[in-house]
Structures are given as C-alpha cells and as structure tokens.
C-alpha cells in the first residue's frame, strides 16, 4: 500500500514512524516532511493545502491512502477533494474541521447544543472589543477566530495584556481574517 502523510511537524513524524512499522506499507511519502522525517520516509515538495495538487500527486504516484496531519489542509478542504477523487483519506471534511479551525463556530455549536462552555463574545470592531474587555475585567482570554499556528489564544492576566492582545489581533500581527472572541 502506498501511503501519503500531509504535513511536516512532530505529529506527522510520529505518524510516519508508526505507519512505517506496518508491513502493509510498501511506500511512505510525507509532504512536505522535514529533515527528521526524511530519515524514515520519502519527502515530497507538495503544498498540503492545495487539494487539486494533492489529488494530482496521489494519482501520479499511485497513492492508496492519505493521512492529513495538520489542521490547515483540513480547513482548506483537502480531505473533501481526496474523497471526491475516490482516494481513501483519514481526516474530516472541511465542514467538520470547522470545529478546530473556528473558535467562534465551536462556541456557537456548544451554545446550540446546550454544552457547557465559557461565556464569550465575538467582535469585528476594535473599539467594541476593548469596551467589552474593560467591562469584563481581567483575567480574561482573548482568542483569534481561526487557525493561528498556536498564537491565537492569549490568557491575559491584566487589562493591559488583554488590550494589547486585541491590538495585536486587529493590528495585523495575527492574520487579519481572524476576529477575536473574548471568553
């Protein structure tokens, strides 16, 4: 069986190591991989967030099964593209991946289901967000809505930290497409 793992981090290294142990694995490719992964698997220069590119690569390399490691390709719909092309894939659809890729969507789902979750508010205006933070006080959690490579959640112990976090999110240090929610 020819297997492709999408990603290049520690999670994908662990997956590659484990999959390589299976005698059914004839060829293991990791894209893009990294130097550590290259010691145990073939690495390929491939954009893991481009569904059409991944599908074409799988067809050209007779890939039987794909494991999507990182959240970004899932949010980009790569698993949907693979399934649409009839390629077996381990990873949720883009719609299901929204639970990971959008904090506000997850909060909305929790609220609709009656699942306990911290109080929250979503803002698209910096002044309104700052007014809310001032009214709530600290400590408070400020989150960017979306994938932010681990930099989207700020636990602000002081009001100044919370206001600085909002400036960072709205000011573009964190991707502009993210809008904060405040827990």
Segments (PLM) and residue ranges:
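Short beta-strand-to-turn element immediately C-terminal to the catalytic PLP-Schiff-base lysine
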Residues: 7, 123, 154-158
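A conserved helix-loop-beta module that forms one wall/lid of the active-site cleft
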Residues: 92-152
């Amino acid at each position: 069986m020819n297997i492709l793992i999408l990603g290049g981090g520690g999670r994908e290294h662990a997956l590659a190591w484990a999959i390589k142990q299976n005698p059914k694995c004839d060829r293991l490719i990791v894209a893009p991989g990294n130097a550590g992964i290259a010691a145990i698997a073939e690495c390929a220069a491939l954009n893991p967030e481009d569904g059409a590119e991944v599908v074409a690569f799988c067809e050209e390399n007779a890939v039987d099964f794909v494991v999507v490691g990182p959240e970004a390709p899932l949010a980009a719909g790569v698993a949907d593209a693979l399934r649409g092309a009839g390629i077996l894939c381990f990873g949720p659809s883009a719609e299901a991946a929204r639970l990971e890729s959008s904090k506000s969507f997850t909060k909305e789902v929790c609220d609709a289901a009656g699942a306990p979750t911290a109080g929250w508010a979503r803002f698209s205006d910096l002044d309104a967000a700052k007014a809310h933070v001032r009214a709530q006080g600290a400590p408070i959690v400020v989150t960017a809505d979306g994938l932010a490579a681990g930099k989207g959640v700020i636990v602000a112990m002081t009001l100044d930290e919370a206001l600085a976090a909002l400036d960072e999110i709205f000011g573009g240090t964190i991707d502009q497409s993210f809008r904060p929610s405040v827990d």
